[in-house]
Amino acid sequence: IEAAKLLDPDDLSVYIGIPFCPTRCAYCSFVSQSIERFGEFLPAYLDALLREIAHTGKLLQASGFHIRTLYIGGGTPTTLSSARMAQLLEAIHTSFDLSRCLEFTVEGGRPDTLDEEKLRVIKAGSATRISINPQTMSDKVLAAVGRRHTARQTIEAFYQAVRAGFDDINMDLIAGLPDDDEEGFADSIRQVLALGPSNITVHTLALKKGAALFSSRAPLPPQEAVAAMLAGAEDALRDNGYEPYYLY
């Protein structure tokens, strides 16, 4: 409500999508493709995206609308190389007036796509917030959902982001992933809390037809266990000073 008071009728949010990932997570139903299989299309996609950004910038300038929030999501935007990320950010600044932008987020969802060079490029491009999303801090669960990184890489990516100058870092976790249980999820919460990100977003696994887990019918934690995961997470987060900040 307080944030809404800062907005005017001419304010808007801009979302820029990069529909590529290192691998496709088993729970994912978004429009996104593995860079290994479809990476040849990335240069053409980026070229088209840059043209669209330029065109959109002209429309915004003519209409008088103001960007208040900007979000680069995906997919995994940090699948882009440092050079391509710099190219994207330069196009954004060339085409968009960000003088009234309250928050500029880049989704760095996969820790294995982050390094200090890329994070510094993103920070230099005036991003104010980055999201580093382990989804779980269990290497066993990560393997079960097809993510090729470890919990250790998540921790390393977090501290790299801090060294790059980010002080607004979000981290996502998902309750209900295969091979997870109440104690495992509680441990993920504990490990993320130990890092002290500014936001912790807890999702519940929601499978749709496009997800590999939907068609495979792999065994998942029972609903009662997922409910307990969420209740435990809320207690732990509130005990550590975190408050609910948005509805997903």
Model-derived segments and spans:
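Conserved acidic functional residues
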Residues: G17-P19, D172, Y248
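Conserved non-cysteine loop/helix-boundary elements of the Radical SAM core domain that shape
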Residues: S32-D235
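Short, well-ordered beta-strand segments
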Residues: V14-Y15, G73
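Local cysteine-cluster metal-coordination motifs and their immediate loop/turn environment
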Residues: G17-S32
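A generic secondary-structure signal marking the coil-to-beta-strand transition
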Residues: D10-V14, R68, G196, G241
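C-terminal accessory regions of radical SAM enzymes
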Residues: R238-Y248
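N-terminal [4Fe-4S]-dependent radical SAM core
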Residues: I1-V14, S63
